[in-house]
Amino acid sequence: MQLDEVKNVLIDTLNLGPAGQALQADSPLLGSLPELDSMAVVTLIGALEEHFGIMIDDDDISASTFETLGSLAAFVSAKMA
């Protein structure tokens, strides 16, 4: 799983700073991070595509994808497979 890399992209994209380092696989994202609004989701998707060299279609994404850091990392890993 790409947990640490996804976490770093998330921290950089949302400008979470040192507080972002506390995020764990089971840390809730959507609805829990005020920085992760609808525009930030779009920006984050672009950053993940660029960093990991993947393509993410709108149909691939659901709220459960962004439920936790672990679910987001698992999604990225699956896209890379």
Where are these regions (language model features)?
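Thiotemplate assembly-line natural product biosynthesis machinery
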Residues: M1-G20, A74-A81
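C-terminal structural segments of small proteins and small subunits
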Residues: I54, D58-S62, F66-K79
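Conserved catalytic core of two-component sensor histidine kinases
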Residues: V42
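Phosphopantetheine carrier-protein modules
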Residues: N15-L36, G53-S62
